[in-house]
Amino acid sequence: MRRGASRMPSAQADVAPAFRKTTETFMAGAKSLPQRYFVSPEVFAQEQKKIFSEQWILVGHQSQIGKAGDYFTTEVAGESLIVVRDKRGAIHGFYNVCRHRGSRLIENTKGQSAAIQCPYHAWTYALDGRLIGAPHMDEVSGFDKADYSLHAVNLALWEGFIFVNLADASTQRGGYISLDKWFAPLAGKFSRWNLSMLRSAKRIEYDVRANWKLIFENYSECYHCLGVHPELSKISPSDSAENDLTEGPFLGGFMRIAKGKSLTMSGNACALPIGSFEAHDFHLVFYYSLFPNMLLSLHPDYVMLHQLRPQSPGRTLIFCDWLFNPEAFKRSDFEPHDAIEFWDLVNKQDWHVCELSQQGIASRAYEPGPYSPRESIPAAWDREYLRYLQ
């Protein structure tokens, strides 16, 4: 979806790196990844072990479970997980596995419940994971419910977004670090957008027949925008990008809104501003990829969030949410579909070319090609990705 550029002061200039043109940070000689990284089951298994089992993985936003008993299920590295808010308001993550004989506890993708009960033998767990009911187990000598709480998964929040980490925090294996430490380089960077307070107006799930890395690479450049996104290019020039994060796990910057007031079908703002912005901020949209499965697009009137869930070397589920100021939902001039329809169109254009790339890369004729200087961010993303597989 992005990148291109020219220099301009940033609202975060006093605390963050300067924004630079995409071409200024390009490392000459960079090429796309070899074929095996997109088609090999062995590489995919490595990714699931070294990345998705050992890093902080985005699974949702706290607004999805606003009340006690609200829950959703998700999958990380092949593991089914339950994310639930307890009666005290705390959010927990548990493996979706009964401590009795291993049955899957919850089949729904989301819901509301006063407790978690196994459908097999009715073992029942409190929302904080404690076993509170186990029929006839008092007949078992030495049985203590306190020994059979649900297995918890590391869970933490950043800016209202919920992350889990399957690594063993107690042993520090896999280079485990806390979520606060992981996101320390971004401290305060997105505070103007009030991310923790936003609410989702819509989620669309996309099933894309392409490797998850192709999604990241596509998001990170606008070299393709003129040909692939005519509607977007009319509003936001494909060569208008500047980036302040150009190496490491967090990459991105902004692009300009040259026509209209927002990236919507009408070109008009579709909701109340989500933060306190200066006049020039209403002409900028910020796009950041946060390794390994989060794409964060920050608009003046909404935030678009992509959550990636790799399924196989050639298939990725993408969950896209549009988040708005909660006060906007009360107003008659709230038009969320103006933004949703626009980006649903752009998303589908992107997924199509990603699927074409996957098909071509699978050919015996494929070999890594040279990146353009306008693709400095995908090249940087590749470098960071390879670091985790070594």
Regions picked out by a protein language model, each given a short descriptive name:
Residues 29, 33, 101, 127, ...:
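Glycine-rich, flexible loop/turn motifs
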Residues 60-67, 144-145, 283-287, 321-322:
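Short linear motifs in intrinsically disordered
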Residues 54-66, 134-138, 288-292:
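Short Pro/Gly-enriched beta-strand edge/turn motifs at strand-loop
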Residues 12-41, 103-117, 151-152, 237-272:
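N-terminal short leaders/motifs
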Residues 3-5, 156, 161-390:
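C-terminal catalytic domain of Rieske-type non-heme iron oxygenases
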Residues 64-181, 185:
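Rieske [2Fe-2S] iron-sulfur-binding domain
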